[in-house]
Each structure stands twice: as C-alpha cells, then as structure tokens.
Amino acid sequence: MKFFLLFLVVLPIMGVLGKKNGYAVDSKGKAPECFLSNYCNNECTKVHYADKGYCCLLSCYCFGLNDDKKVLEISDTTKKYCDFTIIN
C-alpha cells in the first residue's frame, strides 16, 4: 500500500520534470537558423512552446520542450556546450 501511495506522488512529478532541451525542428526536419538570441527565444516559446530559447552555434536551441516535440540529433559534446552556455 505504501508503494502504491509513493507511486501516486512520484508519477506527477516525473511528468513535470520530463521536459527536454535541443534544437527544435519544423515539419521539414530543419532547425531555425539565427544570429540573435531574442529571435530564438520568440521562436522557441511561441512556435515550439518551450520555456525559453537562445542562439547556439547559429541555430535556435530550446529549453523545456515537451517530450512529443522532435529535436535535431546532435552530438553529446554540442548538447553539453549549449546546455552549459545558457547557465553561465
């Protein structure tokens, strides 16, 4: 019974924390190109419904995308670089 109650408490939290980061792609499989972070923030939040976005390596990198959104496959090094850059 305790396990079941714990499961009911943890399940909604996992849904909230289940967001991902990456280059969101359109229907053609292309990530938006950019030079300015403000453009990417608008693109990510209004078009892809992410929490925020910025320009990383000339493409819009979005934070807080829903799990059902498609993202561009990138190397772990690029992902770590873009994740690290926004923190600092």
UniProtKB/Swiss-Prot annotation:
CDD domains: neurotoxins_LC_scorpion. SUPFAM superfamilies: Scorpion toxin-like. It comes from the Eukaryota. Its main location: secreted. One of its GO terms (cellular component) is extracellular region. Residues 20-83 form the LCN-type CS-alpha/beta domain. Gene3D superfamilies: Knottin, scorpion toxin-like. GO terms for biological process: defense response. Pfam families: Toxin_3. It is found in: Secreted. Expressed by the venom gland. Residues 1-18 form the signal peptide. Transmembrane segments: none annotated. Disulfide bonds join C34-C55, C40-C60, C44-C62, C56-C82. Keywords: Disulfide bond, Ion channel impairing toxin, Neurotoxin, Secreted, Signal, Toxin, Voltage-gated sodium channel impairing toxin. GO terms for molecular function: sodium channel inhibitor activity; toxin activity. Excitatory insect toxins induce a spastic paralysis. They bind voltage-independently at site-4 of sodium channels (Nav) and shift the voltage of activation toward more negative potentials thereby affecting sodium channel activation and promoting spontaneous and repetitive firing. Has the structural arrangement of an alpha-helix connected to antiparallel beta-sheets by disulfide bonds (CS-alpha/beta). Belongs to the long (4 C-C) scorpion toxin superfamily. Sodium channel inhibitor family. Beta subfamily. This is Beta-insect excitatory toxin LqhIT1b. It comes from Leiurus hebraeus.
